[in-house]
UniProtKB/Swiss-Prot annotation:
Assembly and interaction partners: Interacts with PhoQ.
Function in brief: Connects the signal transduction between the two-component systems EvgS/EvgA and PhoQ/PhoP, by directly interacting with PhoQ and thus activating the PhoQ/PhoP system, in response to acid stress conditions.
Topological type in the membrane: Single-pass type II membrane protein
Protein name, as recorded: Two-component-system connector protein SafA
Organism, as annotated: Shigella sonnei (strain Ss046)
A GO cellular-component term linked to this record: plasma membrane
Record has Transferase as a keyword: no
Keywords: Cell inner membrane, Cell membrane, Membrane, Signal-anchor, Stress response, Transmembrane, Transmembrane helix
Length: 65
């Protein structure tokens, strides 16, 4: 009986940690996207094209490694 109670509490704690980790990741991604779109909003169209090109080259080079 006691072992089952302890096991359930450990499982609940693990679930809580997992849920909190997901929430933190979602918040960080949201803040990152807000920062990116804010930066894009402050740049002109030509700057966005240059950044998109550089980002594409960076992603392609990262995948080739």
């Amino acid at each position: 009986m006691y072992a089952t109670t302890v096991k359930n509490k450990i499982t609940q704690r693990d679930n809580y940690k997992e849920i909190m980790s997901v929430i933190v990741v979602v918040l960080l991604l949201t803040l990152t996207l807000i920062a990116i779109f804010s930066a894009i909003d402050q740049l002109g169209i030509s700057e966005m094209g240059r950044i998109a090109r550089d980002l594409t080259h960076f992603i392609i080079n990262s995948l080739q490694d």
